[in-house]
Swiss-Prot record:
The lineage of its organism: Eukaryota, Metazoa, Chordata, Craniata, Vertebrata. Residues 91-100 have a biased composition (Low complexity). It is found in: Nucleus; Chromosome. Chromatin-associated protein involved in DNA repair by promoting homologous recombination (HR). Binds double-stranded DNA (dsDNA) and secondary DNA structures, such as D-loop structures, but with less affinity than RAD51AP1. This is Nuclear ubiquitous casein and cyclin-dependent kinase substrate 1. It comes from Homo sapiens (Human). The modification Phosphotyrosine is found at Y13, Y26. GO terms for cellular component: chromatin; cytoplasm; nucleolus; nucleoplasm; nucleus. Its main location: nucleus. Widely expressed, with highest levels in thyroid gland, prostate and uterus and in fetal liver, thymus and lung. Residues 111-124, 132-145, 232-243 have a biased composition (Acidic residues).
Length: 243
């Protein structure tokens, strides 16, 4: 079967004057039609997952930001607490050092006051003892004088002893120097001469036969008289001069 023929109308474009301009304006004014592209279910799932992940990431980031802020605040508080602790420790140390210095000052003052009191108490005792010390020193001086007097006495005694010896010594000197001269007198006692003594000592042989031994008186007469002291010799010499 043949198809029916359609009625065709011939259109003259020349009738329209602004055909080219209209096309240009139309192309400028109306852009291409926007068509929505249908996304596949996989892409939708991926988008959903990415959205969830982005939300989770944002939440995590927010949590992290909050935590960091909290940490910063805690660290700031900790630093402040540490600073306060350090300040307290320093204050305690300073207070302890001040207390120790005050105690030392108090002890030094107490010791100084005690020493002053002891010095004040010792001052009158020293004043009292000063006189006794002077007396003791005077006694020492007396002792020294006594010792010096003893030495002087010893020296005087030593000097006096040789004087006594000198007094005793002249007697033997006089004995040695004084030689009594033979006295010529009748009844005076004197040293016999050598001739007389020889005659008396050498008797004749006849007399020896006739006479017995000579009595002891003759022997005594023949012996020289004992030596007299210088004074006695001087006394004997005086009467000899008178004769």
């Amino acid at each position: 079967m043949s198809r029916p023929v359609r009625n065709r109308k011939v259109v003259d474009y020349s009738q329209f004057q602004e055909s080219d301009d209209a096309d240009e304006d139309y192309g400028r004014d109306s852009g291409p039609p926007t068509k929505k592209i249908r996304s596949s279910p996989r892409e939708a799932k991926n988008k959903r997952r990415s959205g969830k992940n982005s939300q989770e990431d944002s939440e995590d980031s927010e949590d992290k930001d909050v935590k960091t802020k909290k940490d910063d605040s805690h660290s700031a508080e900790d630093s402040e607490d540490e600073k306060e602790d350090h300040k307290n420790v320093r204050q305690q140390r300073q207070a302890a050092s001040k207390a120790a210095s005050k105690q030392r000052e108090m002890l030094m003052e107490d010791v100084g006051s005690e020493e002053e009191q002891e010095e004040e108490d010792e001052a009158p005792f020293q004043e009292k003892d000063s006189g006794s010390d002077e007396d003791f020193l005077m006694e020492d001086d007396d002792d020294s004088d006594y010792g010096s007097s003893k030495k002087k006495n010893k020296k005087m005694v030593k000097k006096s002893k040789p004087e006594r010896k000198e007094k005793k010594m002249p007697k033997p000197r006089l004995k040695a120097t004084v030689t009594p001269s033979p006295v010529k007198g009748k009844g005076k006692v004197g040293r016999p001469t050598a001739s007389k003594a020889s005659k008396e000592k050498t008797p004749s042989p006849k007399e020896e036969d006739e006479e017995p031994e000579s009595p002891p008186e003759k022997k005594t007469s023949t012996s020289p008289p004992p030596e007299k002291s210088g004074d006695e010799g001087s006394e004997d010499e005086a009467p000899s001069g008178e004769d």
